[in-house]
């Protein structure tokens, strides 16, 4: 990998996944990316002063392998999307391949998370009502930074007392709010026109 990338003048490696961060940092990072730093995308966005001005209020699921290393993840999330954030505790039940390899255990974990989500819904709706942010029966969003957790959280869509629970990445929610609903096709178009260098490793 180091030989493949050595022609690029890389200063910073930005990652969005906690497991990827840990693997890169723990496996000869300095040999592969000499003189580079590694940073989580959420902390990178804060560094660049990119944040939502008027977040509608969110639930936040902190993954077991959080990529946010510089400060408490909740502090980072609130700085990015606003103070109206309620942390949703407990594992989502996905845990990498746990949902596939041990559905018996995963299902029990899922039941506990479902109970937690109902409490979190009540707490977030109270925060939203106090700040006039959303209708009492509006759908809620739960944000995370982990691909496995996003998959697990997507299974809870119908489990709230009122409204639906929509799971998404923090950075995707920010892109949608800052750049508009069509941010993804526009990004792909720019990338395909030469905006991103593709390296096969």
Residue ranges and their predicted role:
Residues 1-201:
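Iron-sulfur cluster-binding electron-transfer modules in prokaryotic oxidoreductases
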